[in-house]
Design a protein with these regions (language model features):
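Cytosolic regulatory regions of ion transport systems
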Residues: 1-447
Length: 447
């Protein structure tokens, strides 16, 4: 597959990293020569130093033979114009990053398709959806639903209250057990566990289960004492904050703390003021946090444009008794630091957007894919095709790569966990967790 990426910042760089693992034919276009040189020294791709707005640039990059053209520059109009040109010059599919929520309205799909833009992506909406979903469960770091919750993956930080520490997984995760441990993040190491592995205190463990067993998982990991989120404090009043308050359940109330007075006035026009209070002030001001009821807040979400500020703000909130903290960390260099400081949930817009786009590059049998930044791993949902390798043998006979495991499957709308003796059938939606593996190595089992 030939893929052309316009824009070497944030999303473009992260996409280049993902694609380099799969040895795709990738071209990266940008006007910043130094940035291109830095990226090309790390990843196996071709670079073009030029403006993406020029037709000759697109021709030089080989857009006429492109399977996918992705425009993720910082300029929304440039992205849309580049996609229109790329489509007219022969690109099969195009994706434009937009900065306006109105542009992703499904009612506009037909219009954008006609002008040459196959898909639009609004990273702030992806981040807001992730945040709102995570706030529903105060005791979980990450949650990923398959087929509207028929299967659920939960990333949980294990504390001393966990009942299943230091026991071999072969004794815990038996075929009849209501959960599987599909991965463990321990320090800087990601483990695809086997039967002799054990869970240890401070591990970030990824559980695969069905929705009705979520309360049981909460009990065995010792999180029943965590209070459910009702009051949310958000630091930073950008687009992600606005969209997150719109997506939060109706039983939650939010306070947005924003430093810029003019932005506060705009926020009062954008949010539901019955559930959301806008406060003009500095979210780093401890007296302000106390005055606004930080001690009665169950979740603190830091969404400023500064990763350091967000991390420090979450640390402060934790010291004031807030259990659920969420930090927007756009600089990947800070992610490991935030993890080591036990910040809580980390949201990275470019990783979410890159995962969303990455799914478009895979075959139609890949329904969903999620890059788990904390574990440096992917979790993907595949549809088993008639006659595919995965349907011809039981799971233990498939010979999956050692850094991949099948967590569960959905058949006729019902979720099931998978054991070695499970026989996957054509049409099943199968969840695969893999660490540092070319996705193409997994795809071939399902074709």
């Amino acid at each position: 597959m030939k893929i052309i990426i316009a824009g070497a910042y944030a999303i473009g760089t992260h996409l280049a990293q993902l694609l380099s693992r799969n040895n795709e034919d990738t071209v990266l276009i940008d006007s910043d020569e130094e940035r291109l040189a830095s990226i090309s020294s790390e990843y196996d791709l071709m670079t073009v130093h030029a403006s993406v707005s020029k037709i000759q640039t697109l021709k030089d990059a080989g857009v006429s033979g492109a399977d996918l053209f992705i425009a993720v520059t910082r300029d929304e109009n440039l992205n849309m114009n580049a996609c229109m040109l790329a489509k007219a010059l022969g690109a099969k599919r195009t994706v434009a990053k937009v900065d306006n929520f109105e542009y992703i309205d499904p009612k506009l799909d037909g219009f954008f398709e006609k002008v040459g833009i196959s898909s639009r992506i609004y990273p702030e909406n992806l981040a807001a959806r992730d945040i709102a979903n995570g706030l529903k469960m105060s005791w979980v770091r990450q949650r990923w639903d398959v087929h509207d919750g028929a299967l659920v993956m939960l990333g949980i930080k294990l504390r001393e209250t966990c009942e299943i520490l230091n026991e071999p997984l072969k004794d815990l995760c038996k075929p009849e057990s209501p959960y599987h441990i599909v991965a463990i993040k321990r320090g800087d190491e990601t483990i695809i566990p086997r039967g002799d592995d054990v869970l240890k205190i401070y591990d970030l463990a990824y559980f695969m289960t069905t929705r009705n067993y979520i309360p049981y998982i909460r009990k065995i990991v010792g999180k029943e004492h965590y209070v459910d989120v009702k009051n949310v404090m958000i630091m930073g009043g950008g687009a992600t904050a606005v969209r997150a308050t719109e997506l939060m359940p109706e039983y939650m109330n939010a306070k947005i703390i924003e430093l810029d007075e003019a932005r506060c006035q705009k926020l009062n026009e954008l949010v539901d003021t019955d559930r959301v209070m806008v406060i003009n002030g500095d979210g780093r001001d401890l007296s302000l946090l106390n005055e606004e009821g930080i001690k009665n807040t169950q979740a603190f979400v830091a969404l400023t444009g500064n990763a350091e500020t967000n991390i420090l703000a979450c640390m402060t909130a934790k010291r004031h008794g807030v259990r659920k903290t969420v930090a927007m960390v756009e600089n990947l260099d800070y992610v490991s630091m935030a993890e080591s400081l036990d910040i809580g949930t980390i949201v990275n817009k470019k990783a979410l957007a890159a995962s969303y786009i990455y799914q478009m590059m895979l075959d139609a049998d890949v329904n969903n894919i999620r890059f788990l930044m904390s574990a440096n791993a992917d979790v993907a949902e595949f549809t088993a095709q008639q006659g595919s390798k995965v349907t011809r043998k039981k799971v233990f006979e498939l010979g999956l790569p050692k850094d991949a495991t099948i967590g569960g499957l959905v058949r006729h709308g019902e979720g099931f966990l998978v054991s070695g003796n499970t026989q996957i059938e054509a049409g099943d939606s199968v969840v695969v967790f893999c660490h540092d593996i070319h996705m193409s190595k997994i795809e071939k089992f399902f074709k």
